[in-house]
């Protein structure tokens, strides 16, 4: 009888211990992203989150990323049909997130009200850029302009001024000196093609894009490769480059400059939780972490800008944050400046396939390296 009592006590102790461990694990022990966001950013974000989860939540989280260009990532999510191999989709145009939500392939983010309310509904005029989904299926994480990257010494040798506006890329002296990624392969290129079409109208816009292709010496396989070939001095300028990709080359020691022309599209780097995600609690915790000052600092130190007016890019003299401010023209927050935007999400969504088809027929099919 005494042995039975000891055995029962042992079972009760084990049950209580197990319950205690469960109570101390508020989130799952794994998190996987599928993302076009470069390793430079997503590795830092995942590492910072894992440290935060251990420190603040008492949880050991194994973090993983599936790198994929935006069109490829979108296609894989559709193919998974609600049984995803990742928990989160991060990066690209918000129009794609809207399409995934329509197909019921996203679940609502359902983060805390404080975190949700810290992000304004939109930014920019005359066309506001949504910074979060009105129906709650995605949320912005950082502001990222798509602009022009250039090699100052090569530009100087060509005898032209440093580019400031999109039209500067059409200078005849830049023939064969521009690098870009096809809009069929890159969301930043696709969005910037949309900007040009919105600025000039369909006919004049395509004329402009054809002229750009005549100055293009290389169509890269990925948008990430555009600043790399410019930084190495293989080309003088790059079109539709995300700010952080250019800054990564600057940190690597290359002589490279960056400018966001008027009407440069500013993406909120959307993030969403996939329907059927195996680790939804960890996914929500990751999103909430990224919206804290600690999470936003991951971006602010790497050439991106805060998604909330609460924070500004700043740091000690000589810090990477201050280097980023200088590199991006003195910008500390996009909420402190006028943001001119002509990109229309509804038009972009409707025109998406037609744009890609016309690019293939009017530019890709006839392009020859100058």
State what each model feature region is.
Residues 24-99, 227:
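Early extracytoplasmic/lumenal segment of secretory-pathway proteins
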Residues 274-340:
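Mature extracytoplasmic/periplasmic domains
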Residues 332-370:
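Conserved C-terminal helix/tail region of periplasmic/extracytoplasmic solute-binding proteins
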């Amino acid at each position: 009888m005494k042995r039975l009592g000891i055995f029962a006590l042992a079972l009760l102790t084990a049950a209580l211990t197990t319950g205690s461990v469960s109570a101390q694990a508020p989130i799952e022990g794994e998190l996987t992203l599928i993302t076009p966001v470069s390793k430079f950013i997503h590795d830092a974000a995942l590492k910072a989150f894992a440290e935060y989860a251990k420190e603040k939540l008492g949880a050991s989280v194994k973090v993983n990323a599936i790198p994929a260009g935006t069109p490829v990532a979108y296609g894989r999510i559709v193919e998974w049909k609600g049984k995803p191999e990742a928990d989160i989709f991060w990066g690209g145009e918000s129009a794609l997130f809207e399409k995934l939500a329509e197909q019921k392939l996203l679940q609502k983010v359902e983060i805390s009200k404080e975190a949700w309310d810290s992000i304004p509904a939109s930014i920019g005029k005359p066309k506001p850029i949504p910074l979060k989904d009105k129906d709650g299926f995605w949320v912005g994480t950082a502001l990222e302009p798509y602009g022009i990257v250039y090699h100052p010494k090569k530009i100087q040798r060509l005898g032209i001024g440093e580019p400031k506006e999109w039209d500067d890329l059409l200078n005849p002296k830049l023939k064969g000196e521009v690098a870009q990624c096809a809009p069929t392969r890159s969301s930043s290129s696709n969005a910037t093609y949309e900007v040009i079409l919105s600025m000039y109208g369909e006919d004049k816009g395509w004329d402009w894009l054809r002229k750009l292709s005549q100055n293009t010496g290389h169509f890269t396989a990925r948008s990430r490769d555009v600043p790399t070939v410019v930084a190495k001095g293989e080309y003088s300028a790059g079109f539709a480059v995300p700010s952080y990709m250019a800054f990564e080359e600057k940190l690597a020691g290359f002589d490279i400059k960056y400018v966001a022309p008027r009407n440069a599209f500013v993406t909120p780097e959307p993030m969403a939780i996939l329907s059927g995600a195996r680790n939804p609690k960890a996914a929500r915790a990751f999103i909430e972490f990224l919206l804290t000052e600690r999470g936003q600092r991951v971006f602010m130190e790497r050439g991106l800008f805060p998604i909330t007016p609460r924070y500004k890019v700043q740091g000690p003299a000589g810090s990477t944050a201050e280097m980023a401010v200088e590199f991006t023209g003195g910008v500390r927050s996009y909420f402190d400046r006028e943001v001119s935007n002509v990109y229309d999400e509804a038009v972009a969504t409707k025109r998406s396939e037609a744009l890609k088809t016309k690019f293939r027929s009017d530019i890709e099919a006839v392009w020859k390296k100058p």
